[in-house]
Amino acid sequence: MLTGSITAIVTPFKNGEVDYGAFERLIEFQIQNGTDGILVCGTSGESPTLSYEEHEAVIEFAVKSAKKRIHIMAGTGANSTEEALRFTTFAKAVGADSALLVVPYYNKPTQEGLYRHFSKIAKEVDIDIYIYNIPSRTGIEISVDTLERLAKDHKNIKGSKESTPNMDRISEILKRIPNFTVFSGDDSLTLPMMSLGAKGVVSVISNVMPKEIKEFTSYALKGDFEKARDMHYYLLEIFKIMFIETNPIPVKTALSLMGMVKKEFRLPLCEMLPQNEEKLKEVLKKYNLI
């Protein structure tokens, strides 16, 4: 079972192209610091601005670079079922360990439509699937009833990434769905979710502090919530600053300040406001990251 700290890794660019040299160094940085898994082509990986070919190439490169030393979760979701099926089939073929599929966005399907979307992919691709619930970005939320139905009907639907502050929802999922793994999708909500029984976090912060996020989740998994709470408050300031602007703008800027990637985005994402970058620098200095 996948548990602990999963880094939602950024996709570095250089002169408009994916910077595979920097990407390989980022993967090694995660492995050397004990991270449990890496999510590629998620929100933090700027997947909406990757071409189909780039999306697949990034997944394949991550799998090959990892060399089975770390779990690779491929972001394969889309608001077209056929597109999501294409990416998920590819991820399985090149050796990804699991797939994260976002709830289809913009077209706002019904719960029955959501069921059929995930059901089709789970039937056709034999890979562990995690459903990504992030209503603030998708405009729709998959219900607990639909998650329960999917988990009952498809043994390869293993869990969900929950980017929601609704702890009643988390409680309902964990109470009603046996052997279903929940990951926090928000660093600052990791502690409350794990106290309810979530098994870890898909983390933005672990791009820059992988060792600390691993330590944080390890305490919670062992039931040592006093130490986990201490870590939560220690990390709280960096949790906040990394979302001063839209993710992944601050975390990629932080990595550039640390000398790990170029400060390069693809439109419509762009560089931080200068005053916000100064605030970010001050926090990074407090944590001795720059």
Curated annotation (Swiss-Prot):
Record Gene3D superfamilies: Aldolase class I
Keywords for the protein's UniProt record, in alphabetical order: Amino-acid biosynthesis, Cytoplasm, Diaminopimelate biosynthesis, Lyase, Lysine biosynthesis, Schiff base
Primary location recorded for the protein, binned into one broad class: cytoplasm
GO MF: 4-hydroxy-tetrahydrodipicolinate synthase activity
GO-annotated cellular components: cytosol
E.C. no: 4.3.3.7
Matching SMART domains: DHDPS (SM01130)
GO biological process: diaminopimelate biosynthetic process; lysine biosynthetic process via diaminopimelate
Site (Part of a proton relay during catalysis): 43, 106
InterPro entries per the UniProt record, alphabetical: Aldolase_TIM (IPR013785), DapA (IPR005263), DapA-like (IPR002220), Schiff_base-form_aldolases_AS (IPR020625)
List of catalytic residues: 132 (proton donor/acceptor), 161 (schiff-base intermediate with substrate)
Source domain of life: Bacteria
Catalytic activity field: L-aspartate 4-semialdehyde + pyruvate = (2S,4S)-4-hydroxy-2,3,4,5-tetrahydrodipicolinate + H2O + H(+)
Transmembrane annotation, as ranges: none
UniProt keyword Cell division present: no
Binding site for pyruvate: 44, 202
CDD domains per record: DHDPS (cd00950)
Pathway assignment: Amino-acid biosynthesis; L-lysine biosynthesis via DAP pathway; (S)-tetrahydrodipicolinate from L-aspartate: step 3/4
Localization in the cell: Cytoplasm
Reported function: Catalyzes the condensation of (S)-aspartate-beta-semialdehyde [(S)-ASA] and pyruvate to 4-hydroxy-tetrahydrodipicolinate (HTPA).
Family membership noted in the UniProt record: Belongs to the DapA family.
Protein name: 4-hydroxy-tetrahydrodipicolinate synthase
Source organism of the structure: Hydrogenobaculum sp. (strain Y04AAS1)
